[in-house]
């Protein structure tokens, strides 16, 4: 049985059940003796953007291949718009795949076809009349900002432009679900931001449901409504993006967040001892109104001279303030660190004792 950390204690429950586009129930897939998916259960609601993040080899690619029917799950259910696809034959899967669009890391455009023809290709395969499919291609090129590139060939496009063509092609058949497999991994940061902004805009305007696979927390932060963390074929943590960023519950999530959350400076980290030192170093994670900074003024008033601020910062994710700070508490009074920790945790902060600073005078 999987141990999945959810955010029920800190996230309000919805007033009514949302319509599900995707539901996975205890999905398992093995390659020989190795479990690639080990009991995956999750859902994606209509109009939602769900980010699935994990390290290489965590099971992300297998999961997305099971969702579009390229891999068969060994057991469990994969429901797309209410229909379980796990037992469908290939001919039964074909119309269902028309409800699923896909964008890839390496674009997968046909070099001998124009941009217009690449976008129209799914409709050609469906047997749609030429005039209708070209009209649809022109509409989508307007959406992705490439109306002037209709007759260009992929070789003349930048990486970001190629991905925009890929997005337009994925939308050609008016899918209910868009799958994104590391779609920004080959792009520079500025282009990545523009592609994420485009996907968010499409999501809002069309109500398109998006499930994106990535190993980059910045991508999740930039676009997703919810995030699920996958490790060794299991969902180990999931919740709204802001709450996972503010209070990660598992080591793998904290590791994935390491590059974008404030970290204790190396020169202090190198001086930490588990047993003795002049100051106790605490990490303090906050979300919501308490993250705005007033909490430390209250702490200073309640316990004068009880701490100094070492490092940290405040961010805004999904319009929620999220903060992480590191504070140092004098170690000469053994009970003081406990009092500080108690004060902060009583006000919804997550506090962790990191150790003693042996180098601060």
Curated annotation (Swiss-Prot):
Annotated membrane topology is: Peripheral membrane protein
**Keyword annotations of the record:** Amino-acid transport, ATP-binding, Cell inner membrane, Cell membrane, Membrane, Nucleotide-binding, Plasmid, Translocase, Transport
**Pfam families the UniProt entry points to:** ABC_tran, NIL
Can you give the residue ranges of the ABC transporter domain?
22-257
Q: Which residues bind ATP?
A: 54-61
| Calcium is among the record's keywords | no
Q: Which SUPFAM superfamilies match?
A: ACT-like, P-loop containing nucleoside triphosphate hydrolases
Its primary localisation, in coarse terms, equals membrane
Subunit details for this protein? The complex is composed of two ATP-binding proteins (MetN), two transmembrane proteins (MetI) and a solute-binding protein (MetQ).
The UniProt entry's sequence similarity note says: Belongs to the ABC transporter superfamily. Methionine importer (TC 3.A.1.24) family.
Give the protein name, as stated in the record. Answer: Methionine import ATP-binding protein MetN
């Amino acid at each position: 049985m999987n141990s999945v950390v959810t955010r029920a204690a800190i996230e309000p429950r919805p007033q009514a059940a949302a319509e599900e586009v995707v539901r996975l129930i205890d999905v398992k897939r093995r390659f020989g003796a190795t479990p690639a998916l080990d009991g995956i259960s999750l859902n994606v609601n209509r109009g939602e953007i769900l980010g699935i993040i994990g390290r290489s080899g965590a099971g992300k690619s297998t999961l997305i291949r099971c969702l579009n029917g390229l891999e068969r799950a060994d057991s469990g259910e994969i429901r797309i718009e209410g229909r379980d696809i796990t037992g469908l034959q290939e001919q039964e899967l074909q119309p269902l795949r028309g409800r699923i669009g896909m964008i890839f890391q390496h674009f997968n455009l046909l070099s001998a076809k124009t941009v217009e023809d690449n976008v129209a290709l799914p409709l050609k395969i469906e047997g749609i009349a030429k005039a209708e499919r070209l009209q649809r291609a022109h509409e989508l090129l307007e959406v992705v900002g490439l109306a002037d590139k209709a007759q260009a060939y992929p070789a003349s496009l930048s990486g970001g432009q190629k991905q925009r063509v890929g997005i337009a092609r994925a939308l050609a058949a008016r899918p209910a679900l868009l799958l994104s497999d590391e779609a920004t991994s080959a792009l520079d940061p500025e282009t990545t931001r523009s592609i994420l902004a485009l996907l968010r805009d499409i999501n809002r305007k069309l109500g398109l449901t998006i499930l994106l696979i990535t190993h980059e927390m910045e991508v999740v932060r930039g676009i997703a409504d919810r995030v699920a963390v996958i490790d060794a074929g299991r969902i180990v943590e999931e919740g709204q993006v802001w709450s996972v960023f503010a209070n990660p519950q598992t080591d793998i999530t904290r590791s994935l967040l390491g590059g974008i959350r404030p970290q204790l400076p190396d020169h202090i980290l190198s001086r930490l001892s588990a047993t003795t030192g002049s100051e106790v170093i605490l990490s303090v994670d906050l979300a919501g109104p308490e993250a705005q900074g007033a909490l430390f003024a209250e702490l200073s008033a309640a316990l004068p001279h009880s701490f100094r601020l070492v490092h940290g910062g405040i961010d805004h994710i999904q319009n929620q303030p999220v903060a992480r700070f590191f504070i140092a508490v004098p170690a000469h009074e053994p009970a003081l660190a406990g009092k500080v920790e108690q004060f902060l945790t009583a006000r919804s902060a997550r506090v962790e004792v990191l150790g003693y600073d042996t180098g601060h005078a």
